[in-house]
Amino acid sequence: MSKKNNLLVAASGTGGHIFPALAVSKEVEDEWNIHWLGVRQRLDANFIPKKYNLRTLNIKTPRKNIFLFYQYIEILISTFQIIRILKEKKINLVFTTGGYISAPTIVASKLLRIPIIIHESNVIPGMVTKYFGFLCNYVLLGFKKTNSYLKNCKTIFTGTPLREQFYKFNFLPEWVPKGRGPLLIVMGGSQGAKAINQILYESLEFLIKKQFRIVHIIGESNQQPFHVKNSKNYIQKKFTNEIAALIQNCDLVISRSGAGTINELIEAEKPSILIPYPDSKNNHQEKNALILAESGGSVLINQNKISKEVFEETLERIFKIKSKKGKNHYEILDLMKKNMENNNKIKSNNEIKKFINYFLKEF
């Protein structure tokens, strides 16, 4: 048996960085020894399997202005730490998905002449891709539109890798509320979304009265549980590993619009109400949401426009019953479903595996 080469996966922070990297790691783990580099006090340790040899560095949250002198000093210190790790683990290739850890990892790898692949999931590239992408051998894109923002990079459209369960059908978990009412999945990403949680709490009485069934994923942040009378149709969880099953089997998703969520909705062909995170860098969540809103598969509501009244009116419009040939159906929801079916799907995991394994020929 030939000796495996060593792949360093640098991904940290939110699920939007971690989950695509996990999907790729699982896809290539038979050909590579996986070593994972993350940041202390982030979500990393909760999600990274022990077999991926997680190492963490103490990297602070980047300031808004990437050109601040002391921020470069922090990157420089981290770069030397990563150089030591790259040498120690005899890394042959680096794959990163952005986040705090990516910039010093790219610089360190370039100094050691180790090939680098970065994946950019968002329509608008993040700061690391924008300012350090030209140092990478390839910049893999989740959306074709992103190419126009990266003129000095070698870009290839691959789509965004998803967790394997999204590529197969999953049955609805037993703990989901039973009944005939429409099933809503409400979530705010891996860290939660206070604004989405709040608007749902305000509208719970309306939702229960209308016989909606609700699964509410509040996120890993310190959200207080919310209790409501007669809540058999409402279930709240901080996190679930069964998110693919929930999205595949629900009627509508209400969520932020991170790149991972957008691609999960495309794969599941699921209609949605998207409420972009207003403070995302370069307003990238709104640009992501527009991909689905412009196709007619989603309703986009900016956070500064959302209210109890707007939220409830939007749901009433989507779930307004129309009669056709003696049968009742949700005309708007059905149209949104049809529009979601028209979005192009690509199994990105396989595409990215091809590029990673291409480098095996070089060693």
Curated annotation (Swiss-Prot):
Membrane topology annotation: Peripheral membrane protein
The EC number(s) this enzyme carries: 2.4.1.227
One MF term in the entry's GO annotations: UDP-N-acetyl-D-glucosamine:N-acetylmuramoyl-L-alanyl-D-glutamyl-meso-2,6-diaminopimelyl-D-alanyl-D-alanine-diphosphoundecaprenol 4-beta-N-acetylglucosaminlytransferase activity
Keyword Cell wall biogenesis/degradation in annotation: yes
Pathway assigned in UniProt: Cell wall biogenesis; peptidoglycan biosynthesis
UniProt-annotated location(s): Cell inner membrane
Swiss-Prot/TrEMBL GO biological process terms: carbohydrate metabolic process; cell division; cell wall organization; lipid glycosylation; peptidoglycan biosynthetic process; regulation of cell shape
SUPFAM superfamilies xrefs: UDP-Glycosyltransferase/glycogen phosphorylase
Keywords of this entry: Cell cycle, Cell division, Cell inner membrane, Cell membrane, Cell shape, Cell wall biogenesis/degradation, Glycosyltransferase, Membrane, Peptidoglycan synthesis, Transferase
Cell cycle recorded as keyword: yes
GO cellular component, as recorded: plasma membrane
Gene3D superfamilies: Glycogen Phosphorylase B (3.40.50.2000)
Entry coiled-coil feature ranges: none
Binding site for UDP-N-acetyl-alpha-D-glucosamine: 14-16, 122, 163, 190, 285
Reaction equations catalysed: di-trans,octa-cis-undecaprenyl diphospho-N-acetyl-alpha-D-muramoyl-L-alanyl-D-glutamyl-meso-2,6-diaminopimeloyl-D-alanyl-D-alanine + UDP-N-acetyl-alpha-D-glucosamine = di-trans,octa-cis-undecaprenyl diphospho-[N-acetyl-alpha-D-glucosaminyl-(1->4)]-N-acetyl-alpha-D-muramoyl-L-alanyl-D-glutamyl-meso-2,6-diaminopimeloyl-D-alanyl-D-alanine + UDP + H(+)
Signal peptide: none
Chief location category: membrane
Organism domain of life: Bacteria
Its job: Cell wall formation. Catalyzes the transfer of a GlcNAc subunit on undecaprenyl-pyrophosphoryl-MurNAc-pentapeptide (lipid intermediate I) to form undecaprenyl-pyrophosphoryl-MurNAc-(pentapeptide)GlcNAc (lipid intermediate II).
Family: Belongs to the glycosyltransferase 28 family. MurG subfamily.
HAMAP family in UniProt: MurG
Protein known as: UDP-N-acetylglucosamine--N-acetylmuramyl-(pentapeptide) pyrophosphoryl-undecaprenol N-acetylglucosamine transferase
GN (gene name): murG
